[in-house]
């Protein structure tokens, strides 16, 4: 029998993907695995990121007999999917920046991508733009500071609007009409981003599309639920997390919240 879905990210950004998946699969079991010891991923060397992510995810999949993996991190998805698929026989779902739908809905043919520096510089991102937004002007905006602002918000801290406005200033000076949130952390602060940029800029992310893909894949997996169905566990890679973050995870229904080093999940 198979166990829960593993949703993986460097930090709490993947919770935006978890929320969308849980809406369509409310009774499924989930393991939210976040590598906060190495946050933010957008600043890591590619070789370090690949090996660390693949080893960590494979270890957790085998430990809990997971049925499917969602790599809920744009920076990681651009690099680690081949390595995971080579080692695991279960479905692996990555997150792709919503370039295609942004190009489809833009009225001015001018869109933007807001992501980590790692995602911005990858050739995979350029190929997406070339394939799906070749007739658009595409502005690229890199920020790791926004990742940390989202982390702080979900941990219960007050969002630093001055820092947020500073990070978004280049976008304010652009005349784009559609902005892709190309990091799963960014939907967590989407309301604040919208407030700064104004109603004239449409924000897009990949959450709903990922949820639909996961639902489709699970329909083709027999015995996808077992006695652990509905159980929610959150595993992190630091020794501890802040009380504020632990509270937020509990509010989302996670009953097991533990460090990877101390979690006894066998």
Swiss-Prot record:
Family designation: Belongs to the aspartate/glutamate racemases family.
Pathway: Cell wall biogenesis; peptidoglycan biosynthesis
One annotated GO biological process: regulation of cell shape
Name assigned to this protein: Glutamate racemase
UniProt-listed Enzyme Commission number(s): 5.1.1.3
Functional summary from the UniProt entry: Provides the (R)-glutamate required for cell wall biosynthesis.
Catalytic activity: L-glutamate = D-glutamate
InterPro entries, per database record: Asp/Glu/hydantoin_racemase, Asp/Glu_race, Asp/Glu_racemase_AS_1, Asp/Glu_racemase_AS_2, Glu_race
Pfam families, alphabetized: Asp_Glu_race
Highest taxon listed in the record's lineage: Bacteria
């Amino acid at each position: 029998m198979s166990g829960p879905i593993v949703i993986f990210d460097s930090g709490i950004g993947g919770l935006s993907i978890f929320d969308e998946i849980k809406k369509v699969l409310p009774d499924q079991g989930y393991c939210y695995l976040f590598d906060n010891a190495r946050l933010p991923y957008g600043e890591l060397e590619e070789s370090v990121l690949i090996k660390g992510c693949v080893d960590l995810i494979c270890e957790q999949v085998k430990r809990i007999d997971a049925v499917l993996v969602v790599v809920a991190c744009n920076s990681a998805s651009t690099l680690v999917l081949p390595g995971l698929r080579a080692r695991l026989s279960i479905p692996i779902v990555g997150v792709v920046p919503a370039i295609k739908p942004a190009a489809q809905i833009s009225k001015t043919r001018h869109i933007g991508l807001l992501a980590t520096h790692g995602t911005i510089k990858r050739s995979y991102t350029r190929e997406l733009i070339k394939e799906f937004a070749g007739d658009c002007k595409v502005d690229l905006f890199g920020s790791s500071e926004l990742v940390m602002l989202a982390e702080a918000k979900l941990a219960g801290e007050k969002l630093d609007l001055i820092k947020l406005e500073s990070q978004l200033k280049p976008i304010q000076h652009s005349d784009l009409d559609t902005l892709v949130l190309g990091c799963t952390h960014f939907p967590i602060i989407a309301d604040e981003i919208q407030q700064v940029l104004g109603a004239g800029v449409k924000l897009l992310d990949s959450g709903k599309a990922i949820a639909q893909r996961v639902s489709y894949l699970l329909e083709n997996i027999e015995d996808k639920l077992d006695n652990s169905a509905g159980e929610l566990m959150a595993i992190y890679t630091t020794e501890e997390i802040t009380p504020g973050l632990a509270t937020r995870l509990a509010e989302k229904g996670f009953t097991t919240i533990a460090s990877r080093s101390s979690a006894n999940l066998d």
